[in-house]
Structures are given as structure tokens and as C-alpha cells.
Amino acid sequence: EKDWRDQPIAVEAKGLTITYPGHLMQPDFKAVDGIDFTIHRSEVLGLVGESGSGKSTTGRAIAGLQKVSGGSLNVLGIEMNGVKERDFKPKRADIGFVFQDPGSSFNPLMTIAENVAEPLIVHKKFSSVSDARKYVGDLLEMVQLPRAYMNRFPHELSGGQRQRASLARALALKPSLLIADEPTSALDVSVQAKVLELFKKLQAEIGFACLFITHDLAVVDMLAD
């Protein structure tokens, strides 16, 4: 098995600072204040902290969803401090994101297949619907969901099943970097363990770099390098 320490760096932060501008009489708020970290390809880095400690903000900055105020953040070879959207856009397909509540990130009016296929359609990966459907079925099987679930709607799945589908969507474009923001905190403990086992298995097979955000040290013990 290849050691991630020998792998190239996927993400590197040096003195990373992210400030939310204050409104009216409120001073600016430093959500992230001068942090340093490195994530190699194939490495899982656990980011632990209380809520409000800037964990999610850091994840959003790596995904290009939040501006960097100071220091340096290099993501897949692109400096995010002052980045132009046109320069970062080609990298977007290479970054997957799993949110805390898959319910809110899925369109309730679309089937699971349509939700999972969304990034494939946005990035024009398949020319025919039948090819896309077959691939989505493969993705669902990869996250241990029956193909028959393709035609179900998000509300017809349990929380754990929705999070599996969310993981399938995040991995649809075969990203080299995955940001998982508290992906199991809304699930029951027994379900949580199963989803984490699956995550661990997929990470070992696919070898994506990952920032795993959580407030739970037990989760980090299980997953992080």
C-alpha cells in the first residue's frame, strides 16, 4: 500500500486567515486566524473543533466557496488568496463536497438518480442519458444502495441512505479531493458507524485526499491519518 507521505501535496495552508466583514457598528469577525496545515493526496486530515471555530469556513475556502482574507491557501496547485473564478473553475470538478445534512443539498423534486447525476450533467460527462443512468447505478452500488433506489425521491430514503447517496454524488466526478463537513453528525450512532466504514473503504480504494470536519474525536480516531 502506498504511503500518503510520499504523495504530492493536494492542499497547503500557511497563515490562512478568513475574516467576515462586520456590519453597521460590528467589528470584523476573524473566523479563521492564521492556521497552517497540509493534506497530501490519499491522506485524510481530521479537522476537529467546537462549533463556531471556523472548521466549516476552512472547508468552504478549500472548495472555493469562501474568500481567503490573508495568508496562503494552495488547492490542487491554485493559490486561493485572490483567485479569479475563471482560473479556479477547471478545478471545481476535482473537488467533492459532502454536507452535514444531505436533505438540504438534494433537490426534493428530483429522483435520487437525477440528484446524483447533477454534477455529471453540469460538467457534461455523458452524451447519452442511458450511459449516465448506468453510471449512476454503479455509483449507488458502490455506496451499497440498491440500483432500484435510483427512482426514489430523497424523502423516501432514511438519513443514512441519503448520506450514502450524497457520498455517491460527491464521488461522481472521481475527485482527487473530498471535503466532508460533519457528514455523519445528523445520523444515529449505529447508522453513523456504517457510513464511516463505507467512507473508509471507498477512501482506501479510490485514494482521494480528504479534509474530514467533525466535532467528534472518536470519528477522527477511526478515519484520520
Give the role of each language-model region.
Residues A172-S176:
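A short, proline-enriched helix->beta-strand linker immediately N-terminal to the Walker B motif
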Residues A63:
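Helix-to-loop junction immediately C-terminal to a conserved catalytic motif
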Residues V116, L167, V195:
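Hydrophobic anchor residue at the start of the ABC signature
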